[in-house]
Amino acid sequence: ANSKLYTVDVDGNVNVYNNNELETLDTYKVGAVVPKDNKAVMAVEETSGDIYVCKGENGVAKISSNGQVNDNFFTCPTFTKPEKTELAGKVKGRANGIAIGSEYIYVACGGYGLVVLDKETGKTVCHRKANAYKNDDCGSANYVAVENVNGEEYVYVAYGQNRVQVFKVTKTK
């Protein structure tokens, strides 16, 4: 994106390289990816240059185009009522995938499902749990993509091993 290459390591170092010579332009510390084998996905907003980094259980970090790092842009929620009641308060969603839409940030947040965030504040606008239907065993939200089709925004979420769900973004009152 923006003629640059972006990488993140498990310790939370985001490196920005010149795409032509692979010279390091900038390095940012956003906090560790937990657990270490978790997906560490980034998205870069082309127009603003803002960088959003998934850190598993540690949520999402935002690096603003001015270099300011918010390592706690979005905090993954802790499950309060899981099926296995002994896990209440101990199991968290994991920020696995991220996509940038025209107005919102979309986070594939593991077993917690899809989370829609305000671009500026990181506050949750809405949430669709992964197991939205009774007897639904779809796994966790792993990857998310967004696409604009004829002026309408669609969000695609890949869950576990058995489905992709498509949402049309609408505004409600």
Language-model region placement:
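Loop/turn residues immediately N-terminal
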Residues: 11-14, 57-60, 111-114, 161-164
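Short loop/turn segments that connect beta-strands within beta-propeller blades
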Residues: 18-22, 64-68, 118-122, 169-172
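Surface-exposed loop and turn segments in beta-propeller and other repeat-based domains
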Residues: 26-35, 72-90, 128-137
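Beta-rich catalytic cores
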Residues: 37-40, 94, 140
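Hydrophobic core register within WD40 beta-propeller blades
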Residues: 42-44, 98, 144-146
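Blade-level signature of beta-propeller repeat domains, shared across WD40, Kelch, NHL, RCC1
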Residues: 139-173
